[in-house]
């Protein structure tokens, strides 16, 4: 990520105040799933302009009753992996760029009410050159990070910027790898914070 120009602070202030007053269900709640179901969202709209199979898929999805994800935990799913590590990705981003990332829900486009988007966060630190920039996070489980977003991710970010009326979006991909046991953790590097290859490491505690 890099900075092209200084952010228009007054414009971003107005937009964020406007968005705070709009209906935006909190992410992963029942209301959020229903809100997304009743429109086309940034994360799925690529199907509408992709292969016939994907076009059929999105039509089929909209013909089915709304699906609310259960509270049960499947620790092997890609969804769980992304949800588990997303807060760590945000913390890394905030630390790396000395910023603060605010959480926002899913909103409707001002004019096209069926078009909806929910970024993983927005830079809200006014004195940061990335103020007002959207953040989209992916934590792949098997795919190798190449530095180039997949087509569906690229479309997702374009729609997010359109719906939120913000001109920039940082795409962050992170991979967190688990050690098999405590011994493997201790043997990888000479400290508790860096691996033998100089990468960051640490302990993640998860509560259910």
Predicted regions span which residues?
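Charged, glycine-rich intrinsically disordered N-terminal tails and low-complexity linkers that flank
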Residues: 1-84, 88, 180, 191-194, ...
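Nucleic-acid nuclease catalytic cores
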Residues: 95-119, 123-208
